[in-house]
Amino acid sequence: MPASKFLIASCSAVLLWAAVLGPHFARPARADETCNSPYLSTLIRGKEDYLYVWTLGVAGMGDGFDKLVTLDVRPGSRTYGKVIAQASVGERGEAHHVGFTDDRRFLWAGGLDSNKIHVFDVGANPAHPRLVRTITDLGARSGLHGPHTFYALPGRMLIGALSNAADGGGVTGLALYNNQGEYIRKYAMPVDSGGDGYGYDIAINPARNAMLTSSFTGRKNYMRDLGALIQDPAAMQRFGNTMVMWNLKAMRPEKVFAVPGAPLEIRWSLREGDDWAITSTALTSKLWLIKKDAAGQWQARPVADIGDPAKTPLPVDMSISADSKGLWVNTFMDGTTRYFDISNPEAPKQTYAKKTGAQVNMVSQSWDGKRVYVSSSLLARWDKRGKDNEQFVKLYGWNGKELT
């Protein structure tokens, strides 16, 4: 199929997370993006109907506020490729990531600046999500700031924050809420045994009683102009360089891995029996493998470069295939979408690359791997200027050899 460019004209075109999903009770055939929590009530493997886009408000565009936008991605539909619904939150708060509750009825969406969590009902009418709740007590109850990752647990939501409410630095933690939006408790990121206290993503492998977290940077950095940040040596030292393996049942840190260069997204292999995960480092442009060694101990080590690390392509989002043999990686600075053959995770090989924009960030694929969604924009003050400040969502077909 030809690449389709879905522009969001009546609201912010900044896309920071793409969900190629639809709740299972709307129609029999639905699809899951492969990064979803394993605790979703049904991991549905079909064809997606709607694309949920959590967009960043831009002054002078629509109402100027952050909003959840719904795109129709049903081929043959008269509204295919068009915005069919918008749910505004009435403010700008640095919209970023979202995540489903385990029952798939609600989508939680965070503001990295506002520190608010907006809850949308996507179950009652999947084509027209509705804002039903805004959670405002994250800072007061947990001391955390910048809700980033929303990871479904049975009846609960585990939230990975980027910063703290005290000094805006990178020392942070995890907050646990129930599905009704009630705060339960906080888990601090470790600052001993080699830990730096930083946080970013969450990924769980229930079969191994294993939870991995990664690390990025605090509000002082992510809300700063990128050009000025890069020119500040002290600020550039304030990025995470660790990952943490947690005992899932005990919710206790068990091992800190040294992973220099801000490890971001984490993807566990989806093949039954596998015991490895993969991540990428934003500042050093490497793929890292987390796997047990011959002695049964978890270890982390670099296994491949992403582009030319000397040019800092800045890998951001990634998407693992359902058979865990392929990995899509977007690099922000050079606007490239790359495909790695990871059939041997010890030695990933880049087999394809395509420039898909000036500043690409998010990448999501359908469960069957035949459709790949790419979007632009990273953070409001990190995005490029002028003509390179592209705001889009693109749908590509993937035939195993090229994006079309």
Predicted feature descriptions by range:
Residues 46, 52-63, 160-170, 214-238, ...:
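Short, conserved, GDST-rich strand-edge loop motifs in beta-rich repeat architectures
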Residues 47-49, 103-105, 154-156, 207-209, ...:
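Short coil/turn segments that connect the beta-strands within blades of beta-propeller domains
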Residues 71-78, 119-129, 180-182, 289-299, ...:
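Short loop/turn segments immediately following beta-strands, especially the blade-tip
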Residues 80-149:
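Blade-loop segments of beta-propeller domains
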Residues 82-94, 132-143, 186-197, 253-262, ...:
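Surface-exposed loop and turn segments in beta-propeller and other repeat-based domains
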Residues 101, 194-343:
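Beta-propeller domains
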Residues 123-206:
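Asp-box/WD-like beta-propeller blade repeats and closely related beta-sheet repeat scaffolds
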Residues 310-387, 393:
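Loop/turn-rich, solvent-exposed surfaces of beta-rich toroidal or solenoidal domains
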